[in-house]
Amino acid sequence: MKIAVTGKGGVGKTTFAATLARLYADEGKHVLAADVDPDANLGLALGFDEETLDSIIPITKMRKLIEERTGAGADNQFYTLNPKVSDIPDTYSKMANGVRLLVLGTVETGGGGCVCPEHVMLRRIINNLVLHRDDVVILDMEAGLEHLGR
């Protein structure tokens, strides 16, 4: 099952996503929670400790990996829409309280550029996941609806 929690800002999307993730984990499901909100707080809401949160590398910080997989770079305006991503959830997520967490990241500064290749990577990760009966993916999305059109 794949669930995207989306909507207006400040309405409790992160709290709801974290609650769903913990409830499914408590039921014995294999849960992957993806924090797609640039104001990433899902890890805190899930009860991850600071040391674990600090050790998570957001997808937006994986510049070399993104360039290798998508061909995106400073000199290239085009990028691959179907990069290899099958290893990313297991390699780059962290586990706490029965929930694996994957973080997209954010734009660090104004004028920092588009995070389109990063969104492509995340979309491919979510689409590529082969789910079994006890697998659940929870996406804590950014406010608004623009990301649904990407």
Regions found by a protein language model. Name each.
Residues 16:
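Hydrophobic positions on the alpha1 helix immediately C-terminal to the Walker A/P-loop
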Residues 13:
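Conserved lysine of the Walker
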Residues 103-115, 126-149:
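Switch II (G3) loop of P-loop NTPases
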Residues 10:
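Walker A (P-loop) phosphate-binding loop of P-loop NTPases
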Residues 85-105, 127-132:
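Switch I (G2) and immediately adjacent beta-strands of P-loop GTPase domains
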